[in-house]
Amino acid sequence: MGKASEMTKQSIADCFIELVVAQPDPRRRIDVTTLVKKIEIDRKTFYNHFDNTTDLVIWIFRARLAEKLRDRKFYQAELDYPAEELHDKYTDLPCYARFYGRREGELNQGPFFRTVCGVLNEQSEYYRRIFGFACYIDFLRYVELLFIPLFKTDIQIMLGKGRKLSASTHEFLAEYHATGLWGRVRLYFSYLNQSIPDQDLDPVWNYAHTAIRLTLDAMFEGPEGNATFHAQLAQKRCGRPL
């Protein structure tokens, strides 16, 4: 895609963000007709760049995040991309950065999560509406599904060579922490109606991965601890109190 085409794509995105934020009723969808009229392009030009407004919402998030991840401060990180099974359109855009610690299996993901929240805070009113009203896309579910496979890879790294989990336990831990993280993000935007206080959260940006590591360590302390953990997990799945 040429420079002029990229500029058109970004102009469409900027105009869409402006219209979403200015919409008096956030439950009402900004359609393609309104968008192309505002930016003074034809519908064909829009569809040359995006499939629909759902695709546009996804690209806005992914393109800005990828731009941040390609910054020099991430040169030591391992960039990762959407899992193949998601059939994501933007497989060329990195969506994750993995920072390895000094110890084997240690991950320090704080810089990445702070960067993600910075991307959201840049357009806080836009993302408040995108998270809060599913008239374009269930954005919360999109980012959850994007991150669950990435967390599964993280867990595999943290397990190392000598420890193994059942497939269901591995999946459970990845889902639990990925959905928990994004649920908290949505809480700020949709219910607390505020941006994420990134500076105040400096001590806990790596909290999800710290919790995963502590959970894994507790599970593998010994046969008794491992059996207890799996029994509690089974009870939780069955809906019985722990």
Specify the residue positions occupied by each region the protein language model found.
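Short, amphipathic alpha-helix enriched in basic
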Residues: E6-V32, R62
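Amphipathic alpha-helical linker/stalk segments
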Residues: E18-A22, F61-N108, Y127-F131
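Helix-turn-helix
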Residues: Q23-W59
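Secondary-structure edge/capping motif, primarily at the C-terminal ends of alpha-helices
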Residues: Q23, L79, S124-F131, M158-K161, ...
